[in-house]
């Protein structure tokens, strides 16, 4: 069993919603709920190339060196769409909040003087081998975070929580994607944008 495998979507698609729920409940209770460290320096053991200790902090769902939180939470949101199970949504709301805070803390990258957010892709989907990982903003990871903030706002309204922070973040992400990643001359989004240097797409 690996978190984030696409097969976990199939239970709902086949009408076997209990299987998807069972899969999610194998992982969601394991989410890291430890206090958030004040600071975490880059990992010397990998020549400061990444920060594995930071990855495994409050909100993380697995000890993997990938960001498999992202597809797992996507599976959770789509399960809620399939089932309309608001009791399960209420039960898992803290996990959703911790996940979104974890994504913001680790992977949110500010662009422009107004610091609009794109999100770094930290091996966050299984089609990862030919995608960019350089600390900048990537379209697929940013699109996931846009959708998840939209869904969090939608769920929040239905379970009596405040949707405003998630609506605001979704709005900022969409503005960032349109301004920083859209290639008007080609009619599609760039795959990524550098954070440093010339900030090329």
Language-model region placement:
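Catalytic cores of carbohydrate-active enzymes
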Residues: 38, 107-120, 134-140, 144-201
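A short, charged helix-loop
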Residues: 124-130
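Aromatic-rich carbohydrate-recognition surfaces in CAZymes
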Residues: 1-115, 138-146
């Amino acid at each position: 069993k690996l978190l984030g495998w696409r097969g976990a979507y199939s239970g709902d698609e086949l009408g076997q919603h209990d299987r998807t729920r069972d899969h999610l409940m194998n992982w969601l209770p394991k989410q890291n709920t430890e206090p958030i460290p004040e600071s975490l320096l880059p990992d010397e053991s990998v020549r400061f190339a990444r920060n594995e200790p930071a990855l495994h902090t409050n909100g993380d769902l697995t000890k993997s060196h990938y960001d498999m939180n992202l597809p797992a939470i996507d599976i959770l949101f789509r399960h809620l769409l399939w089932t309309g199970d608001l009791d399960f949504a209420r039960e898992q709301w803290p996990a959703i909040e911790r996940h979104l805070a974890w994504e913001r803390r680790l992977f949110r990258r500010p662009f422009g003087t107004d610091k609009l957010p794109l999100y770094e892709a930290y091996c966050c989907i299984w089609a990862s081998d030919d995608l960019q990982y350089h600390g900048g903003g990537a379209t697929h990871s940013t699109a996931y975070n846009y959708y998840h903030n939209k869904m969090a706002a939608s769920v929040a309204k239905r379970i009596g929580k405040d949707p405003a922070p998630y609506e605001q973040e979704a709005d900022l992400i969409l503005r960032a994607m349109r301004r920083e990643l859209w290639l008007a001359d080609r009619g599609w989004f760039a795959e990524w944008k550098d954070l440093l240097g010339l900030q090329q797409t």
